[in-house]
Amino acid sequence: MNSSYHRRVPVLGELGTSTSSQLPSTWPSILIPLGSTEQHGPHLPLDTDTRIATAVGRAVATRMHGRLTQCQPGWLLAPPIAYGASGEHQSFAGTISIGAEALRVLLLEYGRSAACWADRLVFVNGHGGNVEALRGAVRQLRAEGRDAGWSACGSAGGDAHAGHTETSVLLHISPEVVLTDRLSAGNAAPLAELLPSLRRGGVAAVSPIGVLGDPTTATAVEGRRIFAEMVDDCVSRIARWTPGPDGMLT
């Protein structure tokens, strides 16, 4: 176990270290980081999306605690869901994808179970490939009367995969796992231009190294800014609590 990583981004958050007897009287809301296990080029770890979602969730939980009144329930960070729909990366070793349908069912059953004792559920998503499953699961949970929503770890103008954006954030939250001697620019074409080839052959069809963007420009300072933007956006969406038709917090 990488102790430095776990000091920065605990895999077990407050929910994981709580006891069952502590929960019935609190009726907490929970933040569930949702990531993936997939290639992130030659320089970032397979759990990059999970690290980011967990770090954002941790920071959001802290911020939400500061907004509570005495009569409001608290927010707990759940242990992350570290597997998602990553079929576009399947050509690369290390990728483990459970597919959109399996993920949808997992999230649906997770939400049904957690809603038995939790107030609100927020999935904090760190991987774009999970969106289809999230939409289907959270839409169903809300149709069943459960107060669920989801938010993405997004940044305006960010590149697509293992490039400047994700590498900068990792340099901020987990610098020890970034292999800076292996940084190499990938395909930086706009995602819209790449989509036809991506759909046919996955990421390997457009980037042999698995990078979409340019990680060579990444810095920890930029990562701090991007990370703060992700946290601010998620906090604002939760505070407004206006889920759209697909359950995404707007």
Curated annotation (Swiss-Prot):
It comes from the Bacteria. Gene3D superfamilies: Creatininase. MftE appears to bind one Fe(2+) and one Zn(2+) ion per subunit. Fe(2+) seems to be catalytically active while Zn(2+) could play an auxiliary role. A divalent metal cation 2 binds at H40, D49, E166. Pfam families: Creatininase. Its EC number is 3.4.14.14. GO terms for biological process: proteolysis; riboflavin biosynthetic process. Its cofactor is Fe(2+); Zn(2+). It catalyses: [mycofactocin precursor peptide]-C-terminal glycyl-N-{5-[(4-hydroxyphenyl)methyl]-4,4-dimethyl-2-oxopyrrolidin-3-yl}acetamide + H2O = [mycofactocin precursor peptide]-C-terminal glycine + 3-amino-5-[(4-hydroxyphenyl)methyl]-4,4-dimethyl-2-pyrrolidin-2-one. Keywords: Hydrolase, Iron, Manganese, Metal-binding, Protease, Zinc. The keyword Hydrolase applies. A divalent metal cation 1 binds at E38, D49, H127. GO terms for molecular function: hydrolase activity, acting on carbon-nitrogen (but not peptide) bonds, in linear amides; metal ion binding; peptidase activity. Peptidase involved in the biosynthesis of the enzyme cofactor mycofactocin (MFT). Catalyzes cleavage of the MftC-modified MftA peptide to liberate its final two residues, which consist of a cross-linked valine-decarboxylated tyrosine dipeptide (named 3-amino-5-[(4-hydroxyphenyl)methyl]-4,4-dimethyl-2-pyrrolidin-2-one or ADHP). Belongs to the creatininase superfamily. NCBIfam families: mycofact_creat. Homooctamer. This is Mycofactocin precursor peptide peptidase.
